[in-house]
Swiss-Prot record:
Role: Cell wall formation.
GO term, biological process aspect, one: cell wall organization
InterPro entries: FAD-bd_PCMH, FAD-bd_PCMH-like_sf, FAD-bd_PCMH_sub1, FAD-bd_PCMH_sub2, MurB, MurB_C, MurB_C_sf, Oxid_FAD_bind_N
Pathway(s) annotated for this protein in UniProt: Cell wall biogenesis; peptidoglycan biosynthesis
Active site: R169, S218, E288
Cofactor(s) required, per the database record: FAD
Name of one Pfam family that matches: FAD_binding_4
Organism annotation: Pelobacter propionicus (strain DSM 2379 / NBRC 103807 / OttBd1)
Annotated FAD-binding PCMH-type domain residues: 25-189
Protein name, per record: UDP-N-acetylenolpyruvoylglucosamine reductase
Top-level taxon in the UniProt lineage: Bacteria
UniProt keyword terms in alphabetical order: Cell cycle, Cell division, Cell shape, Cell wall biogenesis/degradation, Cytoplasm, FAD, Flavoprotein, NADP, Oxidoreductase, Peptidoglycan synthesis
Length: 295
């Protein structure tokens, strides 16, 4: 794999440990870690990677990502510099994929807009939230999304929400599509009301989800009509440990890094939990975290 001579305006790092770029603090090295400056820089990099036959993976802040210990062959592309947020009028806000969720909510608040306060306490970026249709309390972020700007087949294109397929904790995108921006349509709302929504969301999440160790948030999706944490609790798996990975004592749908964990520890703990839930409850859990890297 020829990685030498790649040219871009942003930052290029070789053999970069992915443990530095995931909230779980695990993961082997990426052959190449790239941080493009903007869409033009990204397009130029992708053209070079395609010419050389180098595979790539785009990420946000790594809050919902589990990278295997062998790392990632090819390039990892971080969209952290795609963080611009702007008001367009008529209740619309455009946010780059790399913009932090809470920062977008705060920006909307300054414009007298609200309706996405439920993402205030969700760690990560707009791109990651959209990719997983992140939500809380029965609402998903796609319900507030008017359109997405994607890098699609190498070209920048805007897709209306009615052109996209999405559901609980997922958005169906074509292979190779990269989310660049989201256009939200929000409600007129007093800043004080939005502040109260933010405060309640952050307090509730701190009370329920402050687990004290690095985690990826909810590790498993909630099966239809059920909650993953109740199923895990029913098996007595709260506190179960494999190496440095543990089922959180605070919230049993959080798998946490108590120190020195490997990706292999998390994968094995996930397998043990899924096996126990299937045997005890007859339900097959599905990971909500995105698992990537060399097997």
């Amino acid at each position: 794999m020829n990685l030498s001579g790649l040219n871009m305006r942003g930052l290029l790092l070789a053999d970069e440990p992915m443990s530095r770029h995931t909230s779980l603090r695990v993961g082997g090295p990426a052959d190449l870690f790239a941080i493009p400056e903007d869409a033009d820089d990204l397009q130029g990099l992708l053209r070079q990677l395609k010419e050389r036959g180098i595979p790539w993976l785009a990420i946000g802040r790594g809050n919902n990502l589990l990278v295997r210990d062998s790392g990632i062959r090819g390039a990892v592309i971080s969209l952290e510099r795609f963080n611009r947020v702007e008001a367009l009028g008529q209740g619309r806000i455009r946010a780059g994929a790399g913009a932090e969720n809470l920062a977008v909510v705060r920006f909307a608040q300054e414009q007298g807009l609200g309706g996405i306060g439920f993402i205030s306490g969700i760690p990560g970026t707009v791109g990651g939230a959209i990719r997983m249709n992140a939500g809380a309390y029965g609402t998903g972020i796609m319900e507030r999304t008017e359109s997405l700007t994607l890098l699609h087949d190498g070209n920048v294109r805007e897709f209306g929400r009615d052109e996209l397929e999405y559901g609980y904790r997922h958005l169906d995108l074509a292979a190779g599509d990269i989310i660049l921006e989201a256009l939200f349509r929000l409600d007129q709302r007093e800043a004080e009301q939005t502040e109260e929504e933010i405060r309640k969301d952050l307090e509730l999440r701190r009370a329920k989800h402050s687990v004290g160790f690095p985690s990826a948030g909810s590790f498993f999706k909630n099966p239809a009509g059920q909650t993953a944490w109740r199923l895990i609790d029913a098996t007595g798996m709260r506190g179960e440990r494999v190496g440095g990975a543990q089922v959180s004592q605070v919230h049993s749908n959080f798998l946490v890094n108590t120190g020195g964990a490997t990706a292999g520890d998390f994968l094995e703990l996930s397998r043990v939990v899924k096996k126990a839930v299937l045997a005890s409850c007859g339900v097959t859990l599905e990971e909500e975290v995105r698992i990537v890297g060399e097997e």
